[in-house]
């Protein structure tokens, strides 16, 4: 299991995943990322025409790499620090539980 998969599984089990996801959503909204991506989607749909032959899956495939590059470094760093804090706190709690008789 990769480190990212282990962290993902751990945060789901502890209930911290939803907190991290909520933080990410709020930060992306605050910095205008969601509006940028929404505009990008709109522009792509206008370019591709209105004949409904462009699927949601195709839109996601085209937008995802561009959208990922638009996430501000500050947001990435904040989330990484939050994840590290959660893992550290939970590791300390586990160590304390092992020490108890």
Curated annotation (Swiss-Prot):
Source organism: Drosophila yakuba (Fruit fly)
Keywords, alphabetical: Activator, Chromatin regulator, Cytoplasm, mRNA transport, Nucleus, Protein transport, Transcription, Transcription regulation, Translocation, Transport
Record PANTHER family: ENHANCER OF YELLOW 2 TRANSCRIPTION FACTOR
Protein name according to UniProt: Enhancer of yellow 2 transcription factor
BP term (GO), one: positive regulation of transcription by RNA polymerase II
Complex formation: Component of the nuclear pore complex (NPC)-associated AMEX complex (anchoring and mRNA export complex), composed of at least e(y)2 and xmas-2. Component of the SAGA transcription coactivator-HAT complexes, at least composed of Ada2b, e(y)2, Pcaf/Gcn5, Taf10 and Nipped-A/Trrap. Within the SAGA complex, e(y)2, Sgf11, and not/nonstop form an additional subcomplex of SAGA called the DUB module (deubiquitination module). Component of the THO complex, composed of at least e(y)2, HPR1, THO2, THOC5, THOC6 and THOC7. Interacts with e(y)1. Interacts with su(Hw) (via zinc fingers).
HAMAP family attached to this UniProt entry: ENY2_Sus1 (MF_03046)
Pfam families assigned to the protein according to its UniProt record, in alphabetical order: EnY2 (PF10163)
Subcellular location: Nucleus, Nucleoplasm; Cytoplasm
Keyword Nucleus among UniProt keywords: yes
InterPro entries (UniProt xref): TF_ENY2, TF_EnY2_sf
Cited function: Involved in mRNA export coupled transcription activation by association with both the AMEX and the SAGA complexes. The SAGA complex is a multiprotein complex that activates transcription by remodeling chromatin and mediating histone acetylation and deubiquitination. Within the SAGA complex, participates in a subcomplex that specifically deubiquitinates histone H2B. The SAGA complex is recruited to specific gene promoters by activators, where it is required for transcription. Required for nuclear receptor-mediated transactivation.
UniProt keyword Transcription regulation present: yes
Entry's Gene Ontology cellular component terms: cytoplasm; DUBm complex; nuclear periphery; nuclear pore; nucleoplasm; SAGA complex; transcription export complex 2
GO molecular function: C2H2 zinc finger domain binding; chromatin insulator sequence binding; TFIID-class transcription factor complex binding; transcription coactivator activity
Similarity annotation: Belongs to the ENY2 family.
Transmembrane regions: none
């Amino acid at each position: 299991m990769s480190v990212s998969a282990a962290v993902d599984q751990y945060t789901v089990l502890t209930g911290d995943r939803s907190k991290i996801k909520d933080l990410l959503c709020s930060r992306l909204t605050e910095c205008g990322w969601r509006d940028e991506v929404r505009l990008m989607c709109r522009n792509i749909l206008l370019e591709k025409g209105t004949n409904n032959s462009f699927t949601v899956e195709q839109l996601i495939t085209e937008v995802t790499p561009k959208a990922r590059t638009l996430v501000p470094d500050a947001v990435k760093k904040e989330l990484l620090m939050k994840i590290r804090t959660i893992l550290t706190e939970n590791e300390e709690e586990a160590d304390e539980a092992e020490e108890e008789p």
